[in-house]
Every structure is written in structure tokens, then in C-alpha cells.
């Protein structure tokens, strides 16, 4: 299963944020997934990639030429913009995890959520890792928009988890669902 990870790349992020992101990834790093990420090598992105590499997971990175020259990965995909990067991460992932991050992470979540709604994409799973309530305001705002008729019930298009163990359990569910779908397709052939 390919797991996209979206997280902050700022070296000025709080230690608490970086540790929470690392704890979440440490919990799933031994599950044999292929991870898909931006090519940045700073902040939480660097921390997360170190955990992925230490566990010998396959890593696909997406970024511009300069970023790709500074990173090590099993597969490198060169793109010209952050929009292209996000699109490649979306397309190359079965599930996308949103860890604590900055405006880029929030923007990508909103973009991916909107795409999932607009295309009725039932094959892509979006997961918000809401440890310490870092996404509470965003989720509350989505609830408000639905209540006021400004948006559909967007909460049905992503899963919120609050701990690394809950993340691991949900990814196991998703993997079973994907494997079941693949087995069903093979049976029909």
C-alpha cells in the first residue's frame, strides 16, 4: 500500500509538533508500506524520512530538481511546481496522512479534500492525525460550513485519528479493504 505523508518542513516548528509527527510515523514504519512525500529535507519532513529510511521502507519523493538533488529516495519524481507535487503525491498514494504542518499542509489537505468531493473519489483515503487537537479549528470550521449550508458534509470524506495507535489500526483497515478489492478483481477475471 502506498501511503502519502503531508507534514511541515519548517525547522522552526515546535519540538512538540515534530515529536508528535515522528511518533505517528514510528508506529506505522514497520508495516511494509511504500511512502510518498515531498522532497524537502528540513523540519518534520526530515525527521519522518529518517524514520522511514531506518525501517527500510521504499520512499518515493516528489519535488523540483534542486530538492531532488538534496534527498535520497528509491524513486524521485521531478515536478515544476508545488501544485504538480501535490498532484503526484495524490495520484501515487492509496491513503494520504496529514500530520501537523504549516500553511502548505493545510492547503494540500483542503485541495485533496475538495478533489475527493468533486470527483467522488472513493478509492483515496484521507487521514488527519489530530494529536493534541492541532486540527480542531479546521474541523470545527468544516462543521460550521456544513451547518450553514456552505459545503457538503465534508467530514464524511476523511478520517480523523487522535493517536499513533489509532492511525495504525485505521491503516490496517484500509489495507484489508484494498487487498479485498484486489482479490475480488482477480476472482472476476
Give the role of each language-model region.
Residues 39-108:
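Acidic/glycine-enriched connector segments
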Residues 13, 67-70, 134-138:
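Short, charged/polar "capping" segments at the starts of alpha-helices
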Amino acid at each position: 500500500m502506498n501511503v502519502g505523508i503531508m507534514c511541515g518542513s519548517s525547522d522552526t516548528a515546535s519540538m512538540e509538533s515534530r515529536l508528535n509527527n515522528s511518533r505517528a510515523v514510528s508506529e506505522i514504519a514497520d508495516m511494509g508500506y511504500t511512502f510518498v512525500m515531498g522532497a524537502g529535507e528540513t523540519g518534520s519532513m526530515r525527521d519522518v524520512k529518517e524514520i522511514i529510511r531506518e525501517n527500510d521502507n521504499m520512499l518515493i519523493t516528489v519535488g523540483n530538481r534542486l530538492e531532488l538533488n538534496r534527498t535520497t529516495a528509491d524513486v524521485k519524481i521531478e515536478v515544476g511546481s508545488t501544485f504538480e507535487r501535490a498532484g503526484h503525491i495524490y495520484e501515487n498514494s492509496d491513503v494520504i496522512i496529514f500530520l501537523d504542518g504549516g500553511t502548505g499542509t493545510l492547503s494540500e489537505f483542503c485541495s485533496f479534500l475538495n478533489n475527493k468531493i468533486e470527483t467522488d473519489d472513493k478509492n483515496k483515503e484521507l487521514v488527519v492525525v489530530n494529536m493534541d487537537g492541532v486540527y480542531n479549528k479546521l474541523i470545527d470550521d468544516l462543521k460550521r460550513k456544513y451547518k450553514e449550508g456552505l459545503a457538503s458534509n465534508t467530514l464524511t470524506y476523511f478520517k480523523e485519528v487522535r493517536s499513533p495507535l489509532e492511525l495504525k489500526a485505521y491503516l490496517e483497515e484500509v489495507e484489508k479493504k484494498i487487498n479485498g478489492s484486489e482479490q475480488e478483481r482477480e476472482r472476476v477475471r
